[in-house]
Amino acid sequence: MQKILSKPEYERRVAETRDARMAWWRDARFGMFVHFGAHTLLGRNEWVMALENWQIKDYEDVARQFRPEPGCTRQWAKLAAEAGMKYMVLTTRHHEGFSLWDSKVNPYNAVAHSGGFDIVKEFVESCHEFGLRVGFYFSLMDWHHPDSWRCAFDPEARARFQAFLTGMLKELLGGDYGKIDILWYDVSRPMESHEGWGSLQMNQMVRGLQPDIIINNRSKLDEDFSTPEEHLTAAEGKDWEACMTFNRISWGYLDSAQAGPYSYNSQGILRMLNTVCEAGGNLLLNIGPMPDGSVPPEAVEPLQTTGRWLKAYGDAAVYGRLTPCTVKRASGVGRFSQRGNKVYFWQFIQSPQLIFGGFETKLKAIRLLPGGTPIPFEQNSRQIVVTPPPAEQCDQIANITVFEMEFEDTPVQNRCSAYPQLHVGEVLVE
């Protein structure tokens, strides 16, 4: 039996390999989350079983009808690649306890219970076809297993439930599905500690099966990255990934005709992507496929447009090793991302003149992307004044034009005061 490491020793070993394991993820910046399961059939949020007080037997009858069309995962992966995403994360099992693979540990699954196919297997194959990294979402909370609530107070139930979870993780990560890049835990209830879940033992086993895997922070251990949900807030001193719903209402499928007005357009997606780039994070944007597995129509055009924009500007302003942005709100019509001494201004609102306040570092050049056309500018101690090119030369994909600003060194910005009376001549008084 493998010796279980102490928490400090385990975390030390994980930290030693983190940079190598996470290099691709830090460069990727943008991924697709997919929430899919028996809840999809009801179309009233992925928490429908709990929110509506469904009895287990009645919900099992719903799950028995879950038979998406073979090939649906290929639609998801194709769209993710078209959108400029670099990885995908699928809910292999959500809180309802229903597994999307042919599990021998959990017969309540898409094959044995519903007579369908191994969705996880097809998902992995689809990701590989389109050059995407593979992530598995795995809910610790379970509304179906009889020990999933008893485990909080009954040691024997806890041992059985831990064995149940561990058995499923071995099925998913033990080699049948090949190399898996991300394990995305969720909702560690009802137990409130890593000791209760046996997370040290569980995650040590996971890393033994998949040495290069990266793991999120939702098993009561910090692991590799933090996961702000429905907000774009950086985790200080840590890698982080903001997971966001597409319609700001539900992770699971909702009626498209009604969800459409609440959903993001391409500008909204790119605005989120800029925020995570500016703060050094990743964006995991969700779709909730329809009952047959097809992509909800309100997601298609915005994601495809986002992908066309990223094809033009992504290599400069999004992908790869960006640096924490030293530029804060130097303009009211756009925001920034940064790579060393090069700052990328994302212009969200077109204007006949651009003025950037507070830069102390000398600006060498401004170029219009993607072609790199030089743009004239003037710089004094308070401002950089730019005359943008005509509208027909600016971005025609999503109306978000990107300018590359190259400085002599990493730019230093003295933020403009909110009180103009503090400005004395050419001197900005703090």
Predicted regions and their residues:
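Mature catalytic domains of secreted/periplasmic carbohydrate-active enzymes
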Residues: 1-430
